[in-house]
């Protein structure tokens, strides 16, 4: 029973070559349950949309028995997002966000990859450590023209990997970048935060001919190229070194200053941008990695500390890099949307099920985000709420989709046989 709009059903057909016929039927039912809200409280509840001869046990088989490749699903989802957003002509540079998030399962036992993680925000009545899963997610960052006629950064999830002991998050980001199978001939820039940008990540991205843009700590040491070489002996690889928080004080003559405006703390503010080409040490054995160090200062906010950014894409302008990094916060919006869809509600215990469930949630969030930004055109009824005027947010679009589907809570039984 296909209750979803025909546009979404047509888009799901792109995933049919990745699985068998009976598996694709279960895949469609799970996506229907996720979008409508039934699968959030139990995957087997997606079988209410199935015909009478469908066995609900096949829902569990999708996560454990059937041969479904999460890597192929993520690669196909990435290709679908790029094709819907840009058509046949891709821009010369694409931005991607990588970050990690946690799902809390305080009473779970004997579930694959369940661990204790440091709780980033204090919750009254909860322990300092969080028991649950950690996911490393990737999202495509692009600009969208909103209802007010302004260009805004938005992002759509394209894949997720499950954190396991023995693997670092930067290494998982590099693995995720390889599994997305991004198109060649395009400059792909990965935007990460201070806890992820590191030498293992830079090595992994360099092997893929991709680039990184991230915020570094104030004590990050960078090097300048040597200005003078000795007449005899070995050539110098590195020149003077300096911490990024001391660049303005020690080497103001080597920095290029620019002025621009950026949306900071709720309003447009003037910012000062200082950048210089530097060298990073330890990424490649015996060789330096060229990068650009960027210092961002907001003069109107005296208590706001400067931002220290580093990018390995030397062709990316400093102002464009700062604006792109400002869009990194969109991944937090994606995490809220994914958790609302049920990222932490999967009740299975197998590792394959935990991994596949995260990919299905990413697919559902990407479809809703593309529809909310007008990339996917859906004819859905409006709710006309007096207390909430916006109809194109992801949450409101999902409620409109539920109103359109009006799912039945009982299954259609076959007619009894007559003798």
For every predicted segment, state its role:
Residues 1-19, 28, 35, 92, ...:
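Single, function-defining residue in the core of a domain
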Residues 1-66, 70-71:
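Gly/serine-rich nucleotide phosphate-binding loop at the start of the catalytic core
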Residues 50, 80-84, 175-180:
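A generic secondary-structure signal
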Residues 54-57, 99, 193, 332:
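Residue-level detector of functionally special positions within alpha-helical transmembrane segments
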